[in-house]
Amino acid sequence: MAVIGSRNATQYTDKALRSLFPSFKKVNMTIVSGLAKGADYKAHRYALSMDMPSIAVLGFGHLYHYPKETQGIRNQLEVEGLVISEYLPNQTPQKYYFPERNRLISGLSKGILITESKSVSGTRITTHCALEQNREVYVLPGSMFNELTKGNLLSAQEGAKIVLRPSDIINDFL
């Protein structure tokens, strides 16, 4: 399951992942995400803390790291999980690499879970990649008054499945 969302993820993402991940672990789900701060970081941190498999997809070569806030979790993933990149080892981060790597995040997964998303964001790009790849798209419910969940609502309007409990995702994969 790919977990995607805002780089400015709030406690809403924390609470949702804490609620969902124990059930994901019971069915041996692997977590896939980028290595950005926010939702990506939180997804990897929770997965590793629960001894769940976790895969990070870089938007640059292995000899670099960005952002510095996620260096510690990357170090842990290199030992306890998997860190991959389609770029040459010495390739520096470039702005356009991050949307490119989003197709790998969704492509490695049977589905994606959107935690918090603005109406225009990298999360929306990953969502469109997932739809093109015939992946399931799941979304946490959001508020029309919260900028960080307007993208969630747009995804729901486009057919994403709203997640209220772990079984809303797990039942699709059993």
Predicted regions and their residues:
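Glycine-biased, small-residue-rich flexible motifs in mid-sequence functional cores and linkers
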Residues: 1-174
